[in-house]
Structure formats: C-alpha cells, structure tokens
C-alpha cells in the first residue's frame, strides 16, 4: 500500500467509537481562542518526505493542535518544540508549524503517531492503540528501505516501534540510543508535552 492510499484510509477510519465521538465533540465545542476556526476533527494522517531517512513517532494528535489543524505536531506547544528542533537540524523549511497550509515542509524526515485521533486526556485505551497498530506497522514497512534513524517520542511510541520491529529487551529511556543490527539507529526520548518542556524534563 502506498502512503497516499494509507493516509486516505486513516482519514476515513471509524474503528474507535470513543475517539470518533471525542474529536467530533471537540471540533464542535472548541475553545475560546479558536472559536472562529473550523476544526479538522477527523483522524490525522502522517506527513513529511516520502523518502525520509529520519522517522519520528509520537503519541497522538492534540485536541486543539492536530485535531484542529489537521496535521500532527501543528498548532500546539509540542509542535512548536519539534518544528524548532527540526529546523535547527536542517530537516524543516521553517521553525514553526502552525497550520496545514503554512509552507512548513519536511526534508528527509517523516512524522507519524501511534494513534491517529486525539484521545481524551491524551491517553488512548489499549484497544484504541491496537486498532491503530496496523497503520503504524504499514508506515514502518513502507519506510524500511530508506529509514536510517528512528526517534520515538515517549514510551508508547518506543514500545510500539519495538513491537513492530521485533526488538526485544530494549528499555525506554530519555536520550538513549540503540544501534540496531539492521543498521538503523533507534533513539528514545521523552515526549515534548507542555508538562515536560515547561518543567525542564525535556
């Protein structure tokens, strides 16, 4: 399956009733600062360079970030942190990721998430993670030949990548690097959540 077909399938996904109801509710009720915006309020596809050597895996879209803008790590504090880091290392065209049509382009990098819908309290259930597993698994397979470095943001992303890749006995930690037998490098990091960045954890 090609990336464009996979992303179309993601957008149409209705496997998780709780998440479908939640993202629709958030899209209708909004928050005051975004009350005049039209929320995406659908599952969110991954994005970036289809021939990327750097694969970044996050947790899930944010309710008023990706769920609003239609692009993960866009329009929220986590997106600000990641966009700045990618720009400073030459992987992004600009240091900000505000909306789907802001001219922010990734170069040799691709960004995805374990769960494609924004979950309540940023915590997806085990069944929701399981339902989305097929999408991440396909993405990792599609990038098998080009990926050189994988960065997992948070333990959930780390655990799911290891499961898909058949990696055992690896332990999640912040700033931990694992050279893999296949030649790739796996880097685990805390997720750039507002709590982690504001408290200095990240």
Regions found by a protein language model. Name each.
Residues 2-198, 202:
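A polyanion-binding, active-site-adjacent surface
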């Amino acid at each position: 399956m090609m990336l464009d077909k996979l992303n179309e399938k993601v957008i149409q996904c209705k496997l998780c009733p709780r998440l479908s109801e939640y993202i629709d509710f958030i899209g209708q009720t909004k928050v005051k600062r975004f009350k005049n915006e039209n929320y995406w309020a659908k599952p969110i596809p991954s994005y970036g360079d289809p021939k990327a050597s750097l694969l970044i895996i996050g947790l899930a879209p944010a309710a008023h970030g990706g769920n609003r803008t239609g692009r993960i790590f866009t329009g929220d504090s986590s997106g600000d942190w990641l966009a700045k880091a990618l720009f400073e290392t030459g992987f992004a065209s600009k240091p900000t990721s505000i909306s789907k049509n802001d001219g922010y382009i990734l170069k040799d990098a691709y960004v995805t998430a374990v769960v494609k819908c924004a979950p309540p309290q940023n915590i997806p259930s085990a069944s929701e993670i399981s339902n989305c597993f097929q999408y991440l698994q396909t993405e990792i397979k599609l990038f098998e030949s080009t990926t050189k470095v994988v960065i997992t943001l948070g333990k959930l992303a780390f655990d799911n990548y290891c499961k898909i890749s058949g990696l055992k006995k690896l332990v999640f930690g912040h700033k931990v690097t694992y050279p893999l037998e296949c030649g790739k490098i796996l880097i685990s990091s805390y997720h750039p959540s507002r709590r982690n960045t504001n408290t200095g954890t990240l």
